């Protein structure tokens, strides 16, 4: 039996003492935890009043100490009592010295996947960690508890009543979770974009028409829609920004875009005549999942774009379109971003045909362009000499600004985020027309400004901005 976790330092500095697993005072319990225990200070003070000594600054140690506090020989009973005390998001892996052949798992608002093997069972927060060992998995739902041994796997609800779980088969190849000769995963995944695009788009275009058998959006339903609402986080939010420009142009319907983390706090105007488009690579993004549930509570129909089959967002959506990008292991998204954009266009074309809002010539032109994109991506990626040359010119710049109009603004936002994530260079993105409204005061001689001008109808004005 093994237990490990790569920890983001949300509580306490990165150090050995704050690393996982966290262990109870007696050493009986060891815990790994993904998430945040919101009431950990209150629980810590309670346990200290009971005479328990803490050695770390983590919220996770509170879980281990609570398990010890409630343990009377029944590990599952101690787990239930502990879960009833903690508030927040968690995916937990728990071992007890008294039961060395058992691993206990529990989740709330944080993904947890179980893997089925021969003479072994597995637990992970991401399915990519499992595909070296098994392709048969199931996804724990909120409030569920799992008990794993080498030979058996049981799942219970919050009252320890048995739960039957549906198995999912993961089609990803083992090689997809390996670097394949590249220095790091991001470089590999950048180079995989053309093939990911082909797998996502080509099977869905048949004889020049977009065919989305996964959807059942009737023309009458689409005509009755008052608007579309896009919800996402991070890079997926930038896809949502691009979706606004694209879908409004193709469907002639208003499109709103909101960060998932803000959706529940902005009193959204959503009804049963609103189609909510949820975008998430993992299908487990906590804020996005919470926003999805709120949208459904308000009566909206939810269509999701996700990359992981069987993920929570996919299961809870009314309709789902998968991006067949394969596992994306690098923190910074690449091929998932590209394929999400592709699916947005497929949705736009599919709905535009049903609504009759796009003339045949324009429909054919967009389809033809979509089919050419993988080849164009390959041409760009093959041009490594120029890419290296420009990188060598600009890597020392302290600040880099991205500007663009329409969809170029959305892509500029993603470019700026990528630069910050990967190079730690300060970067911001602005709508090109807003450059003169205060932003220009940040630009000095030598400041690098990256201007995106691919959107033909505005590129001329864009390029003639004052410099």
Predicted regions span which residues?
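Phosphate/diphosphate-binding loops
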Residues: 129, 135-149, 276, 280-315, ...
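Short glycine/serine/threonine-rich phosphate/pyrophosphate-binding segments
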Residues: 40, 236-242, 284-291, 313, ...
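Short acidic loop-to-helix transition motifs that present clustered carboxylates
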Residues: 62, 87-88, 130, 257-266, ...
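Glycine-rich oxoanion-binding loops at beta->alpha junctions
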Residues: 6-17, 208-219, 244-279, 426-441
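Conserved small/polar residues in nucleotide/adenosyl-binding loops
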Residues: 461-467
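Conserved short alpha-helical segments that host acidic/polar catalytic motifs at enzyme active sites
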Residues: 1-179, 183-184, 195-226, 238, ...
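Short, solvent-exposed amphipathic alpha-helical segments in soluble enzyme
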Residues: 19-21, 49, 108-111, 139, ...
